[in-house]
């Protein structure tokens, strides 16, 4: 039985990658297209003046984007993790691994994650677990990677669509609180592409969580992936569940939203998307499916070159936004239009204030 469970887990990991790559050929809207930055025609800064440094859970990093959690737990995904680690090392950006549950249950799979630290010994690496993982096992996940931080992914929609997924969730908050108190490294609680509302963030903040990844809709759709894995495809009505990245970011502009650090991910396609997310308060911006898609279609060298170009393009966008650094960018006026504006109005977000901030 254990061997069958292990094989099922490995197959699921490979299917996640294959289906995720297929999805990234044509991504769903992330609502970021409804956000417009108001720039300047007389910039105060030169490109060389721009400072892209930021912090993730208290760690200073030179660039405001990172490789988000996606994979690990099979022979095939070991190779992908190795290439992602090489990208992270060469581009000097943080990296999170995919859920380590497979390796915690089957020690023969530990190397599919550990390869990341071997290739990138000095980089910032985030371990990744579910709230289902007991504390001692979670500490093993951190040790496995000599991780600098711990991602705890919350994914009820994915679990419910997954035939072999979890069906009990009421203990998650207590488990998360325990990790926040006892983890030897900082904790980030992240969604997996269904987005966090400000109410969810407030609930997490109430138990001591100090950093979240809003992880909205628009990138890899795990409801669709799990539904595609089912023979009956019985949950096709749930494929649009959740809130988009833009909606999650706008929701955090509400006057009653908790004042904690947040990251953004989900459907990030280019440097302009990164700048929009940073302008709406994110400290850094994560990408997973798009990077793996680039790896598959363009190869390792081209993917590294693309991300290096993004750094220069980010500096150009900061100049156009008249912002020397991320702190200044967070005061840049923004126009919210289209469906996102309608959504924000119903959620009582002061869009006029956003449009006229200084």
Swiss-Prot record:
Enzyme class: isomerase
Cofactor(s) annotated in UniProt: FMN; NADPH; Mg(2+)
Entry's localization field: Cytoplasm
A GO term from the CC aspect: cytoplasm
Name of protein: Isopentenyl-diphosphate delta-isomerase
UniProt-annotated binding residues for FMN: 69-71, 99, 128, 190, 220, 267-269, 288-289
A GO biological-process term: isoprenoid biosynthetic process
Domain of life: Bacteria
Similarity remark: Belongs to the IPP isomerase type 2 family.
Residues that hold substrate according to the record: 12-13, 158
Function per UniProt: Involved in the biosynthesis of isoprenoids. Catalyzes the 1,3-allylic rearrangement of the homoallylic substrate isopentenyl (IPP) to its allylic isomer, dimethylallyl diphosphate (DMAPP).
Recorded GO MF terms: FMN binding; isopentenyl-diphosphate delta-isomerase activity; magnesium ion binding; NADPH binding; oxidoreductase activity
Assembly information from the UniProt record: Homooctamer. Dimer of tetramers.
Residues at which Mg(2+) binds: 159
EC number: 5.3.3.2
InterPro entries reported in the protein's UniProt record: Aldolase_TIM, FMN-dep_DH, IPdP_isomerase
Principal location: cytoplasm
This protein's UniProt keywords: Cytoplasm, Flavoprotein, FMN, Isomerase, Isoprene biosynthesis, Magnesium, Metal-binding, NADP
Catalytic activity: isopentenyl diphosphate = dimethylallyl diphosphate
Gene3D superfamilies noted in UniProt: Aldolase class I
């Amino acid at each position: 039985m254990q061997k069958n469970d292990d094989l099922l887990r490995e197959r699921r990991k490979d299917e996640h990658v294959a289906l995720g790559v297929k999805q990234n050929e044509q991504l769903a809207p992330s609502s970021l297209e409804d956000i417009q930055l108001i720039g300047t025609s007389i910039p105060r800064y030169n490109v060389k003046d721009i400072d892209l440094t930021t912090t993730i859970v208290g760690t200073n990093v030179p660039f405001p984007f990172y490789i988000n959690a996606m994979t690990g737990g099979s022979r095939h995904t070991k190779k992908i993790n190795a290439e992602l680690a090489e990208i992270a090392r060469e581009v000097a950006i943080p990296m999170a691994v995919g859920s380590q549950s497979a390796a915690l249950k089957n020690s023969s799979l530990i190397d599919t994650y550990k390869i990341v630290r071997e290739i990138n010994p000095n980089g910032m690496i985030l371990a990744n677990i579910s709230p289902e993982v007991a504390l001692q096992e979670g500490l093993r996940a951190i040790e496995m990677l000599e991780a600098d931080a711990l991602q705890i992914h919350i994914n009820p929609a994915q679990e419910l669509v997954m035939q072999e997924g979890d069906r009990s969730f009421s203990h998650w908050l207590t488990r998360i609180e325990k990790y926040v108190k006892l983890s030897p490294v900082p904790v980030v609680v992240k969604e997996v592409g269904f987005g966090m509302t400000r109410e969810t963030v407030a609930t997490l903040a109430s138990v001591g969580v100090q950093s979240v990844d809003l992880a909205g809709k628009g990138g890899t759709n795990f409801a669709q992936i799990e539904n595609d894995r089912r023979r009956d495809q019985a949950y096709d009505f749930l494929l649009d569940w959740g809130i988009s990245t833009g909606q999650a970011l706008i929701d955090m502009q509400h006057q009653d939203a908790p004042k904690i650090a947040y990251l953004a991910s989900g459907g990030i396609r280019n440097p302009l998307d990164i700048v929009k997310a940073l302008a709406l308060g994110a400290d850094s911006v994560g990408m997973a499916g798009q990077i793996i898609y680039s790896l598959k279609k363009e190869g390792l060298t081209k993917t590294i070159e693309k991300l290096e170009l993004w750094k220069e393009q980010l500096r150009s966008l900061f100049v156009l936004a008249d912002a020397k650094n991320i702190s200044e960018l967070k005061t840049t006026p923004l126009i919210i239009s289209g469906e996102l504006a309608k959504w924000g109005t119903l959620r009582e977000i002061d869009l006029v204030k956003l449009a006229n901030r200084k």
